[in-house]
C-alpha cells in the first residue's frame, strides 16, 4: 500500500505572554507555511530526503520552520502514482518535487499550474517533460542524472573485466517509460563491441528468481541493471545478494548497490540531483518561475568497486579499472 507521510503540524501553546508579542511578530505567525509535495515512485529513503532538504536549506528553507513537506511514496507500485499526484494537487501544494522518472511523468499529467521540479535519469525532452533543457517552458523544470546516457559505459566496464565473455544481459522493468530508450541504447553499444545482449525483465520481486535462472542458462558473462529504475533501485540489496549467490558479475547505477555487496556501480550522483531539486523548489518558493530555470545536468559520475565481492566471485579487477574508481570497497 502506498505510503503517506503528512505535513508536520507544529502547535504552540499561547500563554499570557502572547499579549506582549509585537504586532508584526503575531502577523508573521499567521502567514501560512508553504507546502512542498514530495512525490516518489520508490520507498522512503532517508539519504535522498536528506539531500533534498540540503537543497532547500541552501535557499533558506528549513522543514518545520518555514516550509512543510508532504511525502508521498508509491513504494514501487507505479499504478498508485496518479492517485498520489492528484492528492497533492487537491491539497494545492506550492511546489511538487517529483523525484523519480515515473513520478515526474505522472505529476506532469496531473497539473499544468502547480510548479513541478523533477529528477530523472533519462532525457526529459524525449520524455515530454520539457520543451528544451535551456528553456523548459510551462510549469516544469528539474535535473537529469544522465544515467541512461552512461548505461553503455557500464557494459564497456563490465566487458573490460570479462574480456573473454561475449554474452551479456540487461535487466529492465518493462513498466517504466524509458525502458525502450535504455534497451535501444545498450543494444547499439553491444553491437559496437561485438557482443550478444539479452534483455531480461522484472516488474515484481517474484520475477527475480526466473531472471537469475535465465542468466545461468544463458551462460551470461555479466549483468547490467538498467539505470534510473526506481523499483529495481529500491531493491538493490536483494539484487546484490542474488548476483553473488548465482555468481553473476553485475554493475548498476547507484553507489548503494556496491555498498550492499554488488560488484560495481557506475552512474550519476543521485544525491547531487536530489539536492538540485531541493534548491530549485526553494527558488520557486521565493518567486522564480520553472520556465526561467534551465534543466540542470548533474555531470558528476562515480565508479564504485567492491573488491570483497570481486574476490568472492573469483575476479581480478584490472589495475586500469581500479585506477579510475572513485571509491574502492575492501
Locations of regions flagged by a protein language model:
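Short hydrophobic alpha-helices and adjacent helix-cap/hinge residues
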Residues: 1-330
